[in-house]
């Protein structure tokens, strides 16, 4: 049994490290320097940290470092927020945070506040909580030590994920209706990628809700299913972008709502002007 647990942790840990490495490349080395790539990197960072954190419950790590117990509990609420911002920035680009962007991180802030009483507990009390959770792995996802009814924290994360994926599908429908007459192969590929990205996330969230209420699986508990779900998303994103890195360049400017039509028309008009008129014309439009 111990050997299986070690292999489970090794798999989750390796996939989590891959997610962090891919996120680092997206954030620092992406030549397109696009806003959307930064959000995708932040999404990968978030789910990789959560995955590794859950994976460490298969080891004695938290017995040696009890003050790190649940330290990343609020990070799980950041992943859906970054996911929505990524989809939105790809389909409808923006260059600065607005009120909606800030509102998306409100659940993470609220849950971080809820976790504060746990964080300030004495080390001896934390060790008792950790030992009990490691003996009964079901308690890891139920979070009885948090100031909420058991399991509400996990449900809140999953429901928030479902709400976000529904919002992402709404964005996909809006973009599809908006550009129905102007699609080309590159933009269609990006659209398919965003659709698959959203679909995979939503399916995994729905499966976790079903498992939470009906306990259909007899082979692994809810915590293990969360681990493998997060690992599956990380692998899907990493492998897909490995074979299709051009998706990081996003949609063409004409499909991103960039107002370039007016400037193009002005440049065409300027071709037919004299040199003196061109100079005056340029001064007016600069």
Residue ranges and their predicted role:
Residues 24, 78-105:
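Internal transmembrane alpha-helix with an interfacial aromatic "cap," most often the third helix
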Residues 239-286:
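Membrane-proximal linker segments that couple transmembrane helices to downstream signaling/catalytic modules
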Residues 1-18, 153-158:
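Hydrophobic transmembrane alpha-helical segments in integral membrane proteins
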Residues 54-63, 116-122, 206-218:
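Juxtamembrane "helix-exit" motif on the non-cytosolic side of transmembrane helices
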Residues 64-65, 135-154, 219-220:
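Membrane-interface segments at the starts/ends of alpha-helical transmembrane spans
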Residues 62-74, 217-227:
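Non-cytosolic membrane-interface motifs at loop->transmembrane helix junctions
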Residues 30-52, 105, 144-212, 224-233:
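Alpha-helical transmembrane segments of multi-pass integral membrane proteins
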């Amino acid at each position: 049994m111990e050997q299986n647990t070690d292999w489970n942790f090794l798999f989750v840990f390796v996939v989590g490290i891959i997610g962090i490495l891919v996120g680092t490349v997206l954030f620092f080395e992406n030549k397109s320097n696009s806003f959307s790539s930064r959000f995708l990197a932040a999404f990968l960072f978030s789910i990789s940290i959560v995955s590794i954190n859950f994976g460490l419950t298969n080891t004695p790590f938290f017995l040696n470092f009890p003050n790190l117990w649940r330290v990343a509990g609020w990070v799980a609420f950041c992943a859906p927020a970054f996911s929505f911002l990524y989809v939105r920035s790809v389909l409808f680009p923006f260059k600065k945070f607005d009120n909606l962007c800030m509102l998306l991180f409100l659940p993470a802030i609220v849950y971080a506040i809820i976790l504060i009483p746990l964080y300030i507990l004495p080390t001896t009390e934390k060790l008792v909580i950790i030992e009990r959770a490691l003996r009964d792995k079901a308690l890891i996802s139920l979070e009885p030590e948090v100031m909420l009814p058991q399991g509400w924290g996990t449900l809140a994360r999953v429901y928030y994920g479902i709400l976000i994926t529904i919002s992402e599908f709404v964005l996909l429908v809006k973009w599809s209706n908006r550009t129905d007459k102007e699609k080309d192969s590159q933009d269609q590929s990006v659209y398919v990628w965003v659709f698959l990205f959203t679909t995979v996330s939503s399916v995994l969230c729905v499966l976790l809700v079903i498992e939470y209420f009906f306990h259909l699986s007899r082979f692994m508990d809810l915590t293990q299913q969360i681990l493998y779900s997060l690992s599956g998303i990380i692998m899907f994103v990493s492998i897909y972008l490995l074979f299709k890195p051009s998706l990081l360049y996003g949609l063409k400017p004409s499909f991103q709502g960039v107002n370039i039509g007016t400037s193009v028309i002005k440049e065409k008009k300027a071709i037919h002007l004299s040199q003196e008129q061109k100079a005056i014309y340029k001064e007016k439009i600069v």
